[in-house]
Design a protein with these regions (language model features):
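Bacterial N-terminal signal peptides that target proteins for export
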Residues: 1-7
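Glycine-rich, small/hydroxylated-residue low-complexity segments
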Residues: 24-568
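Hydrophobic alpha-helical targeting segments used for export or membrane insertion
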Residues: 8-12
């Protein structure tokens, strides 16, 4: 079993289990009115109602937050309950979670449904009610009936039966419980007990984790919740079968969480991270001081399938130490903003800034004549429609599936095939062609939608050094005053393979394009390329002050370079 397979096993098992819990804003007490209104005789029925409602909530949340996005890969999330047996102070029930996945998640293979049964205990009494808790629910996974999960793990990890059983047994030691409050607040926790997996020279020693989710049943479907995760130290060893070398990775405790409130505020915090890798070339330590972030106006938009609002986050003091020698890397800042426009479309943008420790770069590569200081990338899309977003995602899903099938047919190669293999290959090739057609149709639809809405794309790239900076920017979209009807675009796009000039002519007469590249002369001098630029690039470059500049624009159907029509 390879290192990444071991890790995947843990994540796969844990995610399936936690999904089976009730998933989770806690009230210290239920309201006094609600508590006193519940009589002892009413409590069993109330507890059952809340238990069933909380399970149904998981399916509703899936529909609102995940189901529409084809790239999520989860095509079905269903929980059913049967055998609910009620007592005076507790009840038992059997719940079944059924999951189905898109083929592109598993290399194009349809793995079928994965089901997990859970034996649930629902406790209710006056002592709990005094704390505001209507029902305390504990879930126990039935590992004796997990054939579908074992089959998936076996097929995807290619692990021994013993290790598959060991991985599934993790579920037996999984502790999941939920406190459902009278005011509809829920606190759900999932704890994974320590375990070890060994396959040949590869191993995983996992010390456990605990996840806590807090939410309100009324607002959880809108993506409002708090999550905290604590992962105990874990170590894994992987062996390279080719050269016989091995590496041991030790990860220190990981703690973090994030939350989204009803007022649209967002916070995220991850405590310092430390990872040690021991291999034949020595000890390498990767560290960072943590991740912090905040946001406002954050709200899930089911049409666009993402959160709206403004968010900023920081990754602080990234550094690497190799055999005692320190290499400070820098900091990362990220900003995003997604807003709905008056037209019903969306403006979405993101900015990424990497503050670089130039001394470290020079230390690693002394031949570099400058010290990099920062790299900034900024992208903004204006007037993006939800339909265009959906078409793009569906196109990417179909394209991914076609690539998966292509990989399968390439494995067969051009060797002589028996009749069964030849027929199977032919069916795969037909399926691949079908997916390629779907992808082409979806991408075409997304383009038509973007043209109709005059969607614009703005891109900026900036690199700063101790000797100056270089920038590139581009802004493009259909002109605001364009009067070309959608039907003309649709016809040109549909016939682009037979008559590409029709689409080119439409773009030439309707596309608004502005692009600029700029670099400080002080930087080109330091890099030793100033003479080359002036001798070989005079046709494309102009000088503005202390900068070399190249500008490209489409001016009413005429492409211009630095204000002059292109000579070709």
């Amino acid at each position: 079993m390879q290192l990444k397979q071991l890790t995947l096993a843990v994540l796969t098992a844990t995610s399936l289990l936690v999904a089976c819990s009730d998933e989770p804003k806690k009230s210290d007490k239920g309201t006094k009115t609600e508590q006193t209104a519940l009589k002892a005789a009413d409590l069993p029925q109330k507890a059952e109602d809340r238990y069933r409602a909380n399970l149904a909530l998981a399916a509703k949340t899936y529909e609102n937050l995940y189901a529409q996005n084809p790239m999520r890969g989860l095509t079905k999330y269903q929980i059913t309950v049967k055998d609910y047996q009620r007592g005076d102070n507790s009840a038992t029930a059997k719940s079944t979670l059924t999951l189905e996945f898109a083929p592109h998640l598993f290399g194009g293979n349809n793995i079928g449904a994965v089901t997990l049964d859970s034996h649930d205990t629902i406790t209710y009494n006056q002592e709990l009610l005094a704390k505001g808790i209507v029902a305390h629910v504990e879930n126990h996974i039935d590992t004796d009936n997990a054939a579908s999960l074992k089959a998936v793990l076996k097929e995807q990890l290619h692990a021994s039966d013993a290790n598959i059983e060991r991985l599934v047994s993790i579920l037996k030691n999984l502790k999941m419980q939920s406190d459902i409050y009278a005011d509809d607040n829920v606190v759900a926790t999932a704890e994974v007990a320590p375990f070890q997996v060994q396959e040949g020279d590869d191993s995983l020693d996992f010390k456990g984790l605990k996840e806590e989710v807090r939410y309100n049943m009324k607002t959880m479907p809108d993506g409002i919740f708090d999550l905290n995760l604590a992962v105990e130290p874990f170590t894994f060893t992987a062996t390279d079968k080719k050269d016989g070398g091995s590496a041991t990775v030790a990860v220190s405790p990981l703690k973090g969480g994030y939350g989204i409130k009803e007022d649209g505020s967002f916070t995220v915090k991850v405590e310092p991270i430390k990872i040690e890798v021991t291999a034949k070339d020595g000890l390498t330590i990767f560290e960072l001081d943590g991740v912090t972030g905040s946001g406002s106006g954050v709200k899930y938009d089911s049409a666009l399938m993402t959160y709206l609002g403004d968010i900023e986050s920081n990754v602080n003091n990234i550094r690497v130490t190799h055999n005692g020698e320190q290499y400070p890397i820098g900091d990362i800042n990220g900003k995003s903003s997604t807003q709905k426009t008056a037209s019903g479309n969306y403006d979405a943008g993101g900015e990424f800034t990497f503050k670089i420790d130039g001394a470290t770069v020079k230390k690693i590569e002394p031949s570099i004549p400058v010290e990099p200081q920062s790299l900034r990338v900024k992208i903004k899309i204006s007037e993006l429609s939800a339909q265009s977003q959906l078409d793009l995602l569906q196109g990417f899903e179909a394209f991914q599936q076609s690539l998966n099938i292509a990989a399968k047919t390439s494995d067969v190669g051009y060797m002589d095939k028996d009749k069964a293999t030849a027929e199977a290959t032919a069916n795969l090739e037909k399926s691949q062609a079908d997916y390629e057609k779907i992808a082409q149709e979806k991408f075409s639809a997304a383009l038509q939608e973007a043209i109709k809405n005059k969607t614009r794309l703005n891109y900026q790239l900036e690199g700063v050094t101790d000797s100056g900076k270089a920038t590139f920017s581009a802004d493009m979209g259909i002109r605001a005053d364009s009067a070309t009807p959608p039907e003309a675009w649709q016809k040109a796009i549909a016939d682009v393979q037979n008559n590409p000039m029709a689409l080119q002519e439409l773009l030439k007469n309707n596309l608004d394009l502005h692009a600029e590249a700029r670099i400080n002369k002080s930087l080109t001098d330091k890099l030793g390329v100033s003479q080359f630029i002036e001798s070989q690039g005079a046709m494309f470059i102009t000088v503005e002050g202390e900068d070399y500049v190249a500008k490209l624009e489409n001016d009413n159907g005429t492409l211009k370079l630095n204000g002059k029509p292109l000579p070709f």
